[in-house]
Amino acid sequence: MWFDWNPYMNQEWWDFADTTFNPKEFAKLGSIISSIPEGFELQKPVTKLFEDRQKMNNGEAKINWGFAEIMAYATLLHEGYPVRLTGQDVRRGTFSHRHAVVHNKIDGNAEMPLLQIADQSKTNLEIYDSLLSEEAVLGFEYGYSATWPSGLVIWEAQFGDFANGAQVVIDQFICLLYTSDAADESWSVYL
């Protein structure tokens, strides 16, 4: 299905956007994403990560990158914005910082705490570990984002140098789009 970009055309994109969020709602979302699913027994490092998130959410510890990132997704989902995240090892996070998906060490069942927020808001959450084919995955996600302006689409290179494998997509689609009108002419992208 092709998305109609007309409502987004000829807009002034420099207007102020209010990104404040109600602190009480923020704490509720933080509680959801830092709670270990009922009946789950996690590996010790993952249990500690969730305990640390609870401390951050309660103001007992400084917020780190992993908590800030997962809370950004939580607030977007809560406000009805869909989120799609792909890349090799994104469910766990390359440096074990994300753990958007956790596994029960007893039976291997998986749980995604953010999904509870998405379900409550009736919006989409998609988090996929991808194969190690950066060019194909970034190309697909770039195309996906071009048809889904209301959602957040992220491709994460597992390590910075892994983006090298997707350099053709970066050069011929993404950078070209922002450096000239050639992308419009070459690829019929009207952003």
Show where each model-derived region lies.
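Hard-cation-handling environments
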Residues: 1-80
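Thiamine diphosphate
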Residues: 67-71, 94-177
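Patatin-like phospholipase A catalytic core
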Residues: 82-84
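Conserved small/polar residues in nucleotide/adenosyl-binding loops
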Residues: 178-183
